[in-house]
Design a protein with these regions (language model features):
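Glycoside hydrolase catalytic-domain context in secreted enzymes
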Residues: 1-696, 700-716, 731-732
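Extracellular and select intracellular beta-sandwich modules with Ser/Thr-enriched
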Residues: 717-721
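Short beta-strand edge segments in extracellular beta-sheet folds
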Residues: 723-730
């Protein structure tokens, strides 16, 4: 009966479950990692979940070295793994192959897009959806059917090392981009797995530490993106976080996984742990006597699959010792089987090498990566230095090791394929490719700062900041680095006689700017940097984040004015670490906000970003029709270049008998406007924009007064509108 394709996924899953032995059920909840580099494949292919063995590298046992994984290699590896899993399963049930994919599939030659924090800077929902669509297509093409993405944790303390994986500090951005990603994955037959449910960091930005979030904070802030990913994005899996909330580890939190996720939101997929998260219930949180009990405790509270390795013996022991019932086991197995039928894995589990090679990193994908990189770059400061002109700037000194490294970021979260792509360029290579025939571009060595800075028309410094999981920061200044002599092609010279300058990057920037005021700093980083020590010394600052494989070209072309920057900050940049946590949507204070020596204002506010052109917003008005609210108007490009502006709508509520954030982003629109052109715009706000939890935690449209602000950043207001709600009716 389970082979009958005319039946629903639920019906087929129930029929198959009824035929399965206890052992086979246990294996469907077991998992295994990629093959080891020892030459022996110790994986058990009866397990229902396998990490993609087409991971970003592979070991050549004859040559004894690592090689990049080609698309053809990826398909062959996954085909073999799926084939073996079918052969070794009594009912021919294939394993689900999963992988990471925050900004590209994490293997071989997959397209490498900007990191999520950079994508968020675009304020472009459609772009993010298209990026996810490409990632989904590339994953599906090689046989990866589940991605551990997107991250929809809200980062409100930039000391957290995983800020780069997020869409920033704002609830609406995380909701919209999370939904866009989930739709892009799921529409291609790839399971989206929003993570990490929930919070994922504690006080001081410390990863995986206990969360002190109240039920109000959880519902108003941290639940929201997950809820929308489930209800609107169609996510069919969820990954739990390592941390605890109110002392209960999220991996075994029945309130989160059953009461909220399943009963309240209607989630019908399966829940997976963050890697070794179930073991952490015992080893880390110490709330059970052993791992076996931790596994059972998690499953009884709504958890399904432990990743990346889960021994069937652990589940078997839990059953034999009475920690776990077969009824609970069946519930989890059913959830997994239902998704395998829905994906079509039970009927057609294999993929085509030819299709994969046509799909992965094709011209359209690379063009999208280029567009994404351009939209993600933010111009923070410009005293008129940018854009540079080859008519005036004839000689440029480039400094910083990062200038000749592909700006993709180095952590687990996305592809390393860009490292092997012959047509991807570092910023230095791109500068020389596109402008080397007009401008002399010199890659400055460690002992040439004074000489080159004095004799060049401009200088560019690329910062070196390595961030990611396990790299939480106690400070947010540029880290000290060792600048080594390099050949002109960027390769390190290892001669011991060469000078190494252990230099503070801040001091280096100041030194360059001292000799050449036409200094541009390009930030290559994953979270905000304290610029107070050098900002006043330089002529321009570009926040580039980690812009992906096409980021080098995008940076070079921005510096020379091929297009106007349009990125906006998805996260607040503080003046110093002493202000943290600092975010715009804070609640008002009883006596003020800030320290004696600091008024609490940021260095750069949320939503901020400069342009090479100028815009004028005119005739803006509030439109209320049948209970729906929109801000309408027209925007004119009155500058000298084509460009794009991101208009933002914030609300501030008062008189509702509960303290609410001073401002909340409720709508935005990225608008392309050609030079001299006038474009009409409408930014709609849904009714839920005016909902909030009252003192009794009732979520509704309560009587209240609001100020709606049309703005280009949270601090740059174009026009305010007043609105009142009485008896759930909106009135101007």
């Amino acid at each position: 009966m389970y082979k009958d394709k005319s039946l629903s996924s639920e019906e087929r899953a129930k029929a198959l479950l009824a035929e399965m032995s206890l052992e086979e059920k246990i294996f469907q909840l077991s998992s295994d990692m990629i093959r080891e580099t020892s030459g022996e494949d110790a994986r058990d292919f009866r397990k229902g979940h396998l990490r993609s063995s087409a991971h970003f590298i592979h070991w050549d046992f004859e040559e004894k070295k690592l090689h990049p994984r080609t698309t053809k290699d990826a398909v062959k590896c996954i085909h073999t793994d799926v084939e073996r899993s079918i052969q070794e399963s009594p009912h021919g049930i294939p394993a689900i192959i999963h992988d990471e994919a925050l900004h590209g599939a994490q293997w071989g030659m997959a397209t490498c897009f900007p990191q999520p924090i950079a994508l968020a800077s675009s304020f472009d929902n459609d772009l993010v959806n298209q990026v996810a669509d490409v990632i989904g297509k590339e994953c599906r093409a090689v046989g990866v059917r589940q991605v551990l993405s997107p991250v929809v944790n809200i980062s409100r303390d930039c000391r957290w090392g995983r800020t780069m994986e997020t869409f920033g500090e704002d609830v609406l951005l995380n909701c919209n981009f999370g939904v866009a990603m989930c739709k892009g994955f799921e529409s291609n037959g790839v399971i989206a797995t929003p993570k990490h449910f929930v919070d994922n960091y504690g006080a001081g930005g410390r990863d995986s530490n206990e969360s002190y979030s109240s039920e109000r904070a959880l519902r108003e802030i941290y639940y929201k993106p997950f809820e929308r990913c489930v209800k609107e994005g169609g996510a069919t899996s969820i990954m739990t976080s390592y941390n605890s909330i109110d002392g209960v580890p999220c991996a075994c939190n029945g309130h989160l996984l059953n009461d909220i996720l399943r009963d309240e939101w209607g989630f019908d997929g399966f829940v997976v742990s963050d890697y070794s998260g179930i073991e952490g219930v015992f080893y880390g949180h110490q709330v059970t006597n052993n791992v076996c009990e931790a596994q059972a405790h998690a499953m009884k509270n709504g958890h399904d699959v432990s990743l990346p390795r889960c021994s069937p013996e652990t589940i078997k022991d839990a059953l034999e010792k009475g920690y776990l019932t077969e009824e609970t086991l069946n519930e989890s197995v059913f959830r997994v089987l239902k998704q395998k039928f829905r994906l079509g894995l039970m009927d057609d589990p294999y993929v085509s090498i030819e299709n994969a090679e046509q799909t992965v990193r094709n011209d359209e994908a690379k063009a999208l990566a280029y567009r994404a990189a351009k939209e993600s770059l933010i111009l923070l400061k410009n005293n008129g230095l940018l854009p540079m002109s080859s008519n005036k700037i004839r000689r440029i000194a480039v400094f910083g090791q990062a200038a000749n490294v592909l700006p993709i970021g180095v952590n687990y979260s996305g592809p390393f394929g860009g490292w092997y792509a012959e047509d991807a360029q570092t910023p230095l290579q791109a500068l020389r490719t596109y402008y080397g025939d007009k401008v002399e571009i010199l890659f400055g060595q460690a002992d040439e700062v004074e000489q080159l800075s004095k004799t060049c028309d401009a200088a560019i410094y690329f910062t070196s900041v390595v961030e990611g999981e396990g790299m939480d920061r106690s400070d947010i200044k540029l880290p000290k680095i060792t600048l080594k002599q390099q050949r002109d092609d960027g390769a390190l010279i290892v001669d011991k006689k060469l000078v190494e300058i252990k230099e503070n990057q801040e001091e280096l920037i100041c030194s360059i700017a001292k000799y050449n005021p036409n200094t541009v700093v390009v930030l290559l980083n994953g979270s905000p940097i304290d610029m107070s020590g050098w900002l006043e010394n330089v002529g321009a600052v570009v926040e580039a984040w980690y812009p992906g494989e096409q980021g080098g070209r995008a940076i070079a072309e921005l510096l020379f004015g091929e297009y106007s920057p349009s990125g906006k900050l998805p996260i607040t940049i503080p003046r110093s670490v002493g202000q943290l946590p600092l975010y715009y949507a804070h609640r008002p204070s009883g006596r003020g906000y800030g320290y004696n020596e600091n008024d609490g204002s940021p260095l750069y506010p949320f939503g901020y970003g400069l342009s090479y052109t100028k815009f004028e917003v005119r005739s803006s008005a509030l439109r209320i029709h049948e209970g729906n609210v929109s801000v309408v108007g027209e925007i004119k490009n009155i500058g000298e270049m084509d460009g794009a502006e991101v208009l933002q709508v914030y609300i501030s509520g008062k008189n509702g008998f509960i303290s609410r954030p001073v401002k909340e982003l409720k709508g935005y629109k990225r608008i392309e406007v050609a030079k001299g052109e006038i474009v009409q715009f409408e930014i709609p706000l849904d009714k839920e924009s005016f909902y909030f939890y009252d003192a009794t935690m009732r979520y509704d449209m309560h009587d209240s007064d609001y100020t709606l602000s049309l703005a280009t950043s949270v601090d740059n207001i174009i026009k305010n509108f007043e609105i009142a709600i009485r008896g759930k009716v909106l009135k101007e």
